[in-house]
């Protein structure tokens, strides 16, 4: 008989997250802000790198940016930051397995989302006013990414959101279940690289790029960059991310491991 490491990891994660949230919402908020900030740091560096390399080889920034961005999510998982998109998998699986209530899952996800956004806004403001972003224009890499995303229909944003969080939680499950530290890192980087390269929609990643552009000198030149459209985009992305990470990754893995003692993860 073999016990499921997946279930034990989910139970531990749910208890840890619920305990911190219940005992100190301030500490939980800080961990959530770190996640939003870490992604903003890697977004900021990747976007400037993309602009520079595009001057040497036009179009090559599309390949560089995802690689640099991916480190931000690696920082989050290795440094115990609270990222809403991975929590969608952990908490949905935990609720199905009765390790945490559905109500508490919804409450933590919304709280985590809010402080992922606040972390991204603070870091985004800082980068937007830094020397690297002093001359940002409509033609800059990050401006193009934000404008492209805001021009998408709800149906496309939903699909891209689903795909993004399947990739993200492939990374998270690899981090949780694989033993070797080096293998964990490369599996995380590979999955994150892929969703960013494909321009899929990830709510916290969008907090990062949108925040940098919103506070920058280029903000007024971005088409459809208004609060109602931004909130529309984020809302649909959140739903897509929940479907991908919670319903298509967390729930199936919880079902596959429940009441099993042979073929388990």
Model regions and ranges:
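Alpha-helical transmembrane segments and their helix-helix packing motifs
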Residues: 1-265
